[in-house]
Amino acid sequence: MTRIVLFLLTNLAVMLIFSLILFLTGIQSNTIYGLLIMSGLFGFSGSILSLILSKWIALRSVNGEIITHPRNEVESWLINTVRQQSIQKGIIMPQIAVYHATDINAFATGARRNSALIAVSTGLLENMTHHEAEAVIAHEISHIANGDMITMTLVQGVVNTFVIFISRFLSQIISNVMSSNRNENNTEEKNSFVYFLVSTFLELIFGILASIITMWFSRHREFYADASSAKMVGREKMIAALNRLKTSHEPQESDSMIAFCINGKSKSFLKLFASHPSLENRIEALYNQEYM
C-alpha cells in the first residue's frame, strides 16, 4: 500500500514539474513534438541522476567502507587482485569497499569505467577461497570494463521515455473522447482528473511490462560478465565461484542494488522479471562456452 501511495504522489509531482517546465519553455505538451521532448527529458533524467550518484547511493545502501590502506592480509590481497585485473582490462583501478553482510556477494557501480567502485561483502571474504573470490572480482571488473552501468542507464532511459510517451499519448486520446461525450460544466477540470488517473494507471502497467526488457538485458549482462571472468582467470575458477554462491544466504542487499550484484535474486515469481539467471543456467553456459 505504501508503495502505491508513493507512486501516486511521485506521479503527481512529476506531472506538476512537467507542466512547469513546459510552461516556462513554451513547449505544448498536447503536441507529439512537445510530448516526445517531455518524455525524453524525464525518461532519462532519473536514470542519469541515479548513475551519477550511484557510488554514493551504493555505499549508503550497504553501509560500505572504502578501503584506502589495507588493515590485514585479506584486504591487501583484495587490493592487489583488483589492481592487477584493472591493469589487465586497461581501466583505472576502481575504489574498493567492504560491507558487512552474511551473504556472499559483490557489486560494481559508477558513472564511468575509469571512476568506478567495487564492493564486496564480508560474507564473501570469509567464505570464498582466493581462487573463487578472484573470479568474482574479475566478474565485477568485466562489468566496469564493458561499460554495463552506462549501457543499463541508456536502456532504462529509452524504456522510461517510451513508457511516459505512450501512456500520456493514450491518456490524452481517452480523456478527449470522454470529454467530447459530455456536456457539463467544469469539463476541463474533470478532463484533467481523468487524464491523471488514466496516465497513472497506464504508466504502472507499461512500467511493469517494460521491466521485462530491462531485466532481460540485466540477465544477459551476467552471462557476458561470467564469460569475461572465465577468460581472465579461468573457467574452472568462475564455475567454482558460482557453485559457492549456491551455499550463500539469501542476498540482503536492497532491491535497488541487487541488479548490480553477482549473487542476485533469480528465484523471481516470474523468470521474466528476474535480474539474474539461475546459477545453474550460468554454470551451464560456462560449460558450453556460451557468450565467450
Curated annotation (Swiss-Prot):
Belongs to the peptidase M48B family. Binds 1 zinc ion per subunit. Pfam families: Peptidase_M48. Signal peptide: none annotated. Its cofactor is Zn(2+). It comes from Buchnera aphidicola subsp. Acyrthosiphon pisum (strain Tuc7). The keyword Ribosomal protein does not apply. It is found in: Cell membrane. The gene is htpX. One of its GO terms (cellular component) is plasma membrane. It is a multi-pass membrane protein. Its EC number is 3.4.24.-. The chain crosses the membrane at residues 4-24, 32-52, 147-167, 193-213. This is Protease HtpX. CDD domains: M48B_HtpX_like (cd07335). GO terms for biological process: proteolysis. One of its GO terms (molecular function) is zinc ion binding. Keywords: Cell membrane, Hydrolase, Membrane, Metal-binding, Metalloprotease, Protease, Stress response, Transmembrane, Transmembrane helix, Zinc. InterPro entries: HtpX_protease, Pept_M48_protease_HtpX, Peptidase_M48. The keyword Protease applies. The active site is at E140. Zn(2+) binds at H139, H143, E222.
